[in-house]
């Protein structure tokens, strides 16, 4: 299929890919080395939308361009299905959960708001906010990735948020980038983690009635 075209839903002949969305899809439907989930229970258009975001070209940090998310991984041991799914979705900044009879996928990417909540459609109009701890607001990330230049040996990408360091000091977070053979992708993983933790510093609890949607 062509990621930048309107997709009819038909697949071409099976080929090798480093696209984490379709690697996950293959692991889910394959009954030999995967889960063996019926294709009819999966929304392949969700995978297609995630794949398009994964394949957008972004700066690689060396003057060139590369795909936003790529996955080069060898799975040679057994593990719980849930663990494998969560590890794979983490590659493209996603989560998976089971709902309405099928596996649902969500990805952290720019999108339109899905629902507007306010005091009028929240029980008693009450929102309860709680801030994250300072220890949870990391200022330095050390991302472990693998390099083709060293035949798959582990390399470490150091990423820091200078403004956050000036405010909180050094608070380090170690990250293992699964299936990552790109220094640029490793850097983006670290940067996204730091910026998210500095920007998303509150959780909000509230209750809604069934009629609120």
Annotate each predicted stretch with a short phrase.
Residues 2-4:
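Mixed-charge (acidic/basic) macromolecular-recognition segments
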Residues 6, 13-213:
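C-terminal extracytoplasmic interaction modules
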